[in-house]
């Protein structure tokens, strides 16, 4: 494990405000993403993700303003996702001060946006976000994944916040995304998201082993050990979490100290 592993808090935004409840002592405004991100910055976050969950044209100007304020106040990489559909959208977000953009549904619908974005701005700016769900109906052309309970499945890419199936194999899509120019994969398993039983290690490991770019594990953290498993068993380069940090169940510093005590290389 030569590379330093990253811990990344994620903030869900709607109309420029944080929507998942946040429970920090001493916050003037629990809904202000820049104040929250600054708190995470102080705790030692390696990066912050802003996800615009109600992305619309009306919201875009508000989001640009938030990104600008965040870029002025934070000294850590900022990734922004949600509703980014075109190269112009990518350009606007990066110009506002974000370091990376995360493409999800738009990448499935128009994969060329990955090629064009990486060509113009560099693949280090383009994160392919994959939402995936288990599918037990095996067929040709999919990657069989053996689960801990002995069952075999494949993982299907889902879009529009998990509401629509695509028939696309998750491992193949990760590989295609990287070929097109994605410099990172942000993987969220719908099986584990929000359940706090740990990351979906089988698909995280499968994708980590099949692409040569960093993989961020997302969805399911509930304990310190879950972070460790994400890195060691899931082979992820970074772990992303939201509610465990927002509700003060653990701090980024406590996660990093735990990981360091178990031999995982982190920036303290």
UniProtKB/Swiss-Prot annotation:
Keyword Protease part of the UniProt annotation: no
Job description of the protein: IGPS catalyzes the conversion of PRFAR and glutamine to IGP, AICAR and glutamate. The HisF subunit catalyzes the cyclization activity that produces IGP and AICAR from PRFAR using the ammonia provided by the HisH subunit.
Subcellular location: Cytoplasm
Catalysis: reaction(s): 5-[(5-phospho-1-deoxy-D-ribulos-1-ylimino)methylamino]-1-(5-phospho-beta-D-ribosyl)imidazole-4-carboxamide + L-glutamine = D-erythro-1-(imidazol-4-yl)glycerol 3-phosphate + 5-amino-1-(5-phospho-beta-D-ribosyl)imidazole-4-carboxamide + L-glutamate + H(+)
Top-level lineage group: Archaea
Keywords, in A-Z order: Amino-acid biosynthesis, Cytoplasm, Histidine biosynthesis, Lyase
Record-linked SUPFAM superfamilies: Ribulose-phoshate binding barrel (SSF51366)
EC number: 4.3.2.10
Any one GO cellular component localisation term in the record: cytoplasm
Pathway it works in: Amino-acid biosynthesis; L-histidine biosynthesis; L-histidine from 5-phospho-alpha-D-ribose 1-diphosphate: step 5/9
Primary localisation category: cytoplasm
Protein name: Imidazole glycerol phosphate synthase subunit HisF
Quaternary state and interactors: Heterodimer of HisH and HisF.
PANTHER family: IMIDAZOLE GLYCEROL PHOSPHATE SYNTHASE HISHF, IMIDAZOLE GLYCEROL PHOSPHATE SYNTHASE SUBUNIT HISF/H IGP SYNTHASE SUBUNIT HISF/H
The protein's enzyme class: lyase
Encoding gene per record: hisF
Entries under Pfam families matching the protein: His_biosynth
Lineage: Archaea, Methanobacteriati, Methanobacteriota, Stenosarchaea group, Methanomicrobia
GO molecular function terms noted in the UniProt entry: imidazoleglycerol-phosphate synthase activity; lyase activity
Family statement: Belongs to the HisA/HisF family.
Active site: 12, 131
An individual GO BP term: L-histidine biosynthetic process
